[in-house]
């Protein structure tokens, strides 16, 4: 499995001959113009995880890609043209297994209505398992080898992020 960080929350996962893009948001531009994607996954509707201005062009340029997103993102961003994914759903992209987990975005402020968030466990056969939680800090699946952890101010407190990373117990954290 090859994992390329494209900026902020966006990563490109290449595994078992498949190319899977996660969270093409507006704080990273390296994903724009990518082609030959087999899947595009979005954890939630915030623009730093799915760029509403440019996502349509990415989807159009990858017309054969499976596009899945948390339900709120599907409804709020029509250009995403995604099918909703919920915790417990399993996708098979070639030999790559993807399981949606979580369901709740980390609390931003007690006065703000909570939104949905799905994290993704991405694995190739019996090999490496990557966990991309989006902005979920409660779901701590076991058996994770690589954690793509949200660790960015001003949205996440470093104490919360470190506690979360330790609780997942992945061999590698990035």
What are these regions (language model features)?
Residues 1-35, 84-143, 154-160:
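Core dinuclear metal-dependent hydrolase active-site scaffold
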Residues 10, 52-59, 74, 119, ...:
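Short amphipathic alpha-helical segments and helix-helix/interface helices
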Residues 21-22, 41, 131-132, 148, ...:
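Structural motif
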Residues 26-69, 144-148:
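Active-site metal-binding motif and surrounding structural segment of the metallo-beta-lactamase
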Residues 46-47, 73-74, 137:
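Alpha-helix capping/helix-boundary segments
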Residues 55-106:
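Portal/gating segments that form or line small-molecule/metal binding sites
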Residues 64, 158-174:
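Proline-aspartate-enriched helix->loop->beta-strand connector
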Residues 148-154:
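Short, glycine/charged-rich beta-strand-loop motifs at protein surfaces that mediate ligand recognition
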